[in-house]
A protein has these predicted regions:
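Primary mode marks residue(s) on the alpha4-beta5-alpha5 output face of response regulator receiver
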Residues: 1-140
Length: 140
């Protein structure tokens, strides 16, 4: 995994981040009930594999994030497994893998939070979409 560098705080970074967080709180409040996330098309990635944090991913929102940044449409919702289901712990946004740090900084100030890029990911040979996200998949 590669992390973006930390930038010095620029004028307006805090205000910009606060505006994003204020909108994100609407999303956070909505998806405290993980059933609503499932109803809205989020799917649990690898639900049968024990994890520290479970990613409820939205392929539609991920694809949308390749061209626009919409705080109300996070690519993934992050949940902790609890005795009666899942407890919302955070939200995650995506950007194109080829974005520069300047482009990422336009989405959210790098002075306040880093972005990360997954590198050296092992994927199965063949049709990635069908292998990773088969039509009858319970996740992905």
């Amino acid at each position: 995994m590669k992390m973006t560098s930390v930038r010095p705080q620029a004028p307006g970074d805090i205000q910009r981040a606060q505006a994003i967080v204020q909108v994100a709180q609407q999303c956070f409040a909505k998806y405290k009930d993980y059933h609503l996330a499932l109803q809205d098309g989020y799917q649990i990635f690898a639900p049968n594999v024990p994890q520290d944090i479970y990613h409820f991913a939205s392929i539609q929102n991920f694809l949308e994030a390749q061209t626009t940044f919409d705080v109300l449409h996070p690519s993934a919702l992050l949940y902790n497994k609890v005795s009666n289901g899942y407890q919302l712990a955070g939200i995650m946004f995506s950007a194109p893998a080829n974005f520069s740090e300047d482009q990422l900084n336009e989405r959210f100030p790098l002075s306040l939070a880093p972005w990360h890029l997954h590198t050296n990911i092992c994927l199965p040979a063949g049709d990635y979409d069908e292998t990773l996200f088969p039509g009858n998949s319970l996740f992905g």
